[in-house]
């Protein structure tokens, strides 16, 4: 089979001058450059200077003539070889020859007299005509290539029809072999065309069509063979017709992409970001208005209508079957908050119009002041929409975590039923499989709805469409196998559709993972594993073997998915300390924690499954379950180590949520102290906004000190320098303590805060020991005294931090009323002032004075005020103590280094590295190979290619067309 008999229709206007391939563009570019240079040789009017000949112009004219001659030779060769566009190509070659001759004469005359505007105008018109003629010749040559591709497509279509019309298996094998040969040829030609296409969307369409053709061609033979062998089974015809349709659509896709025709409506539906994400983006843009021109009648209805549309979409997500009750409540609460924030914002706009308060004398340029009420209202509105986005993302991630768990189980159950030949059972499991497939598609579309990743959304929607169309055919293959369970052909057909389904589900899973945040995934997975751990413990205590087995399986599946996704994520980063730490946590979970958990599950199920339940160590199971949760949490902590504070802020609600849930579960520890059913951290999170604002001010000051410490320790390599290691440890613990005052972080109760303070004191003691050793070796007495003075500060502030944490422990709740145990607090402060006095008396007066006394004074900590004010005072005292300690650590690190340099200067190069610690500059941090892109950056992303100022031949050609003749 070598040629097609029916005519080939080219969906391309030969008169069009649209350049569609990179080859045509690259061939045309030199000629455009030469002509442009020639025309611009003299762009000035008549001159009073003596006229003369321009050697450069003559050289350029000759180069244009030579380039035209090359086009003529190539064009004549293509015209001789072409079968379909021979006449058009010959005509185009003659036109180029004619326009080339005109251009040669005009350019020669212009080169002789470059100052003549008339001759210049004549040459411009000739150049325009020549470029148009050459462009048309190249496009016709490009069309000839497309015609050759379409000829191959026609041959493949005929071969496909021959396969479809095969009457027996032997005939099918022969015809399919011929079809395979033509497929190889077509794939080669299509791949070349794909590389040539200029439009990236057309290249994507070509790649997708080629992939679909290759994928379905492998299914074509088994589906056709099953139909020929079992033509009496209706499902076999459905399988065969489906595969043929897919192959035909792939061939049509190659044809459309090769000709760069407009995509179908279905493909256009796949483009664009998520509907809900787009609506939120547009709403965020619309709320920023010019206050001086604000009109309530004009803007209020529009903004309210947009918001209600967004809330309707959020409500649909909240009402979905897989949305958890607590998540639904949060979405509803955020919707109400957004509504209220919009009303507050509109009120501020009206107030500004009424009273003109938006601009003051110092900002008449129109710039909003930071503390302006309108600016605050806009920020609040933006924050509320961001909070709503976060809850919607978490809701979608809830769905993904549940639906994309053990995705192959419904399929395996269906196949096992089919192998047994039980058609009734197959139909029952087919319904389960269909519901599972529908759920995957639904969840994928939900993920798309809130994603700003346009390319990722397109891939997810295309993969979901494939899942939707493939699902009935998998069921048909199962029905065929159920009808003929002993048939090898039916089994092979089932295996092919099974493999195709699993591949497509993997594609969909990876596509969904690409448009969702790893941080959101870890946050939700951690929460779900905690829920499952609690269910396991309850099932264990109640002796419910089925629930225990099923839930333990879910835990294993969730943990395996966490490990897989994080390992894949780390491949995007260059190997370094960060990736090593993350991979260590995943390795620990997969190789140590999960095997132990599986072993304990097996022991528990075996003990409970006997007629007489056997006793076993319940605490061992609980510990193994707890380790799974802790392992996932450690992975999440390791992943978040390089996140910015802004990125970590999005996880703030979950930080509060998971620990509070944990404190009320069956795996809570003995030190989980609760006040009226709430942890101390939860109580801190419920403080009034005014109190939170005051705490936030203190935290901001603390962060300033922290940034100083970060800058200092970032200079040094901590290998061989325990002072830097201890400084980092103290910084991390102090961050956790300040997070506690805001109702966040891992510290949950007052006992946790006390333990954290003890750890800081221990680290401070170790730092004191090391730094004193450095001071002892320092020959410079001034540096030595400075270092010792800073060490005294550390001792003082560690003691102060201990006191502030212990004072919080004296706060108890009796009968719902917050009181403070005065005895404990008084004794604590008595001890403190004695120690503080000794420290200050022993230090240098220039370094330490009475102003270093702790900020957590007696009056601020005794419960004379309300519960909220008491909590506020203790919180601010804790933050101030941490800030003071942070500052002392910074000064100690600096002084230790200075003291070490003095030691080196005195004792020479033999002591470059101190016996106590080694001061080595830290190597530059390694950057990820692939930049992590925030979802909101996809809209505003600028591609590198667009930054280059490159004028395409088409643009230059259009400039010639726009030039006026002289």
From Swiss-Prot:
Basic and acidic residues bias locations: 924-940
Subcellular location: Cell membrane; Cytoplasm; Cytoplasm, Cytoskeleton; Cell junction, Adherens junction
Function: May function as a linker between cadherin adhesion receptors and the cytoskeleton to regulate cell-cell adhesion and differentiation in the nervous system.
Gene Ontology MF: a single term: structural molecule activity
Keyword set includes Nucleus: yes
Main location: membrane
InterPro entries: Alpha-catenin/vinculin-like_sf, Alpha_catenin, Vinculin/catenin, Vinculin_CS
Recorded GO CC terms: actin cytoskeleton; adherens junction; axon; catenin complex; cytoplasm; nucleus
Name of the protein this chain belongs to: Catenin alpha-2
Region (Disordered) location: 924-952
Entry superkingdom: Eukaryota
Basic residues bias: start-end ranges: 941-951
Family, per entry: Belongs to the vinculin/alpha-catenin family.
Natural source organism: Xenopus laevis
Membrane topology: Peripheral membrane protein
Keywords: Cell adhesion, Cell junction, Cell membrane, Cell projection, Cytoplasm, Cytoskeleton, Developmental protein, Differentiation, Membrane, Nucleus
GO BP terms, alphabetized: axonogenesis; brain morphogenesis; cell migration; cell-cell adhesion; dendrite morphogenesis; regulation of synapse structural plasticity
Coiled coil segments of this chain: none
